[in-house]
Each structure stands twice: as structure tokens, then as C-alpha cells.
Design a protein with these regions (language model features):
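A short helix-breaking turn/cap at a secondary-structure junction
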Residues: 14, 151-235
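Amphipathic alpha-helical segments in well-structured domains
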Residues: 56, 147, 232-236
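Short glycine/serine-rich loop segments
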Residues: 65-189
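Acyltransferase
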Residues: 227-252
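Short, well-ordered alpha-helical
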Residues: 1-52, 57, 76-83, 206-208
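Short, well-ordered beta-strand segments
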Residues: 28-30, 72, 214-218
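Flexible, acidic loop-helix segments that line cofactor/substrate-binding pockets
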Residues: 202, 213, 249-262
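Non-transmembrane alpha-helical segments in soluble domains
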Residues: 2, 6, 60-64, 118, ...
Length: 262
């Protein structure tokens, strides 16, 4: 992997820093450069933050408890995880990293903001990579670069030690070329963090009783067809079996304004 990074990273612009991965590690992973990793600087792609030193984020500390996983570097990203500019820029661009490139071909977009993490996974630079999502920042680059991406429920993974974009929407997650790698890294990230008010342990929810509680789903005009898919029907059935009362209401599409969420 280190050799692949050396040979191809200058063209793909995925990795900001790295060292040789540990030989003993079974999963060699990279972290998006808005996530604190004490071994490397953390910039969120911003020239203004180029020399910022952060301690390990909570999720990184949790991962380090698993000796089979080695965090050996940082990936480039869309600057500040979402452009703060009056200019229209390409997904995956940052002042420090330049323009990321999809390894499947320059004619394909890399998307963002976890662009470097997705590119690195697709190019074989790592087994998995950490990313963050505020509005599609994990899922869109995963789809564009042909890798698996997982955005957990907000609070399932602590946000402590991560440069924020929107406290209402930010969620750390994982990208990987394999589902097994994704599952292993995600499981290692879990843990209750008292410094993050949204933090919870997913397994503890199974112990709670939800009888009589109502879950309201807001559905836009273009999403009604999805309600009849087998996967969604199974999901709704499981919620009802868990004691929830389910309601659906129409929600008109809101005018897009990225500033609202940040």
C-alpha cells in the first residue's frame, strides 16, 4: 500500500500524510483530514489550519484499542468539509490538496467531501478510511468511486475531536472496499462519549421499551415510491414490532441553501 501511495498519489491527490503501515496490522486505514489524529497535522484542507495539531478524536482513541487496526495517515477532502466561498469549485478541491481524481478515470467525478478517503480506498491505498458526513459527504464519494460507504446515525459515533461543519448534522463514518472491513472499523469506533451530548451506544437501544411512541416520517413527492420497496417494508414492519406507531406526512421540498445547515 505504501508503494502504491508513493507511485500514484501525486496524480490522484488522495493522501496528505502517511507512514509505512505496521506489518502486524490486518486493517490499514487512513483518516479524513478533519479528524484529529495526534501523529499528524489536521487541517480540514484549509491553508489557514495547515499547522493545526489536534489530539486523537474520540473515535480514533477507540480504534487504537484494537491492535489489528492501524491508522497510518490522513486523506485530503473538500475544503472544510464543505466550501465556504463565493466561487463555484469542483467537489474534492482544497487549498492544500488541490483537485482529487477518481481512480476509475479523470472523466468521472470524485465527489466530496470525503473525497480523499473514497479515492484512497478505490485505489488500494488502504483497506478502509474514516470520513465524515453532513450532507452526502460519505455516500456520494463512495458511490462515485465504487466503494462501500456507511454513514451511522448521528450520535452512534462521537464527534469529539473532529473539526465541525454543522453540529446538527455531522456524523463520522467509514469507507472500505469490503463490507467486512467496514463492519470491523465501525464496531471499533463505538463507545459512549460524555463530552458529546449526542453520543449513545447503539446496543443499549435494544434494552429500551418504545411501546406507544410515534415515529413521524416526512416524505417528499419523489420518495413515495420507495415506501413500497421490500427493504423499506421490512424496516417499517420491524419498527412496528418494536412498539412504534408509524405515521407518514407529505413534506414539500425545501429550497436548497447550504448555509442553513452550517
Amino acid at each position: 500500500m505504501f508503494v502504491r501511495i508513493r507511485d500514484y498519489n501525486e496524480n490522484l491527490r488522495a493522501v496528505r500524510f502517511c507512514r509505512r503501515p505496521k506489518d502486524s496490522a490486518k486493517l490499514r486505514i487512513l483518516a479524513k483530514d478533519n479528524i484529529g489524529v495526534q501523529d499528524f497535522l489536521t487541517s480540514a484542507g484549509s491553508y489557514a489550519l495547515r499547522d493545526l495539531v489536534l489530539p486523537d478524536a474520540f473515535c480514533v482513541r477507540q480504534i487504537r484499542k484494537n491492535p489489528q487496526i492501524d491508522i497510518f495517515g490522513k486523506t485530503h477532502l473538500t475544503e472544510l468539509a464543505g466550501f465556504v466561498t463565493t466561487r463555484v469549485l469542483k467537489d474534492g478541491y482544497s487549498e492544500l490538496g488541490g483537485f482529487g481524481r477518481n481512480p476509475h478515470g479523470a472523466q468521472y467525478p470524485c465527489r466530496g467531501s470525503s473525497s480523499g478517503s473514497a479515492i484512497a480506498c478505490a485505489a488500494g491505498f488502504c483497506d478502509a478510511a474514516l470520513g465524515t458526513e453532513t450532507r452526502g459527504s460519505l455516500m456520494m464519494p463512495a458511490m462515485a468511486n465504487g466503494v462501500f460507504g456507511f454513514k451511522p446515525t448521528r450520535g452512534a459515533v462521537s464527534r469529539s475531536g473532529i473539526i465541525p461543519l454543522s453540529s446538527s448534522f455531522d456524523a463520522p463514518g467509514v469507507l472500505s472496499r469490503s463490507l467486512s472491513g467496514l463492519k470491523t472499523v465501525f464496531s471499533a469506533m463505538l463507545g459512549k462519549d460524555d463530552s458529546d451530548p449526542q453520543s449513545f451506544v447503539p446496543s443499549e437501544l435494544r434494552k429500551k421499551k418504545f411501546n406507544g411512541r410515534t415515529l413521524l416520517f416526512l416524505v417528499s413527492s419523489g420518495d413515495y415510491a420507495a415506501l413500497n420497496t421490500p427493504a423499506v417494508r421490512r424496516f417499517i414492519s420491524a419498527l412496528k414490532q418494536g412498539g412504534f406507531h408509524i405515521e407518514f406526512r407529505h413534506a414539500p421540498m425545501a429550497e436548497f441553501d447550504y448555509k442553513i445547515i452550517s
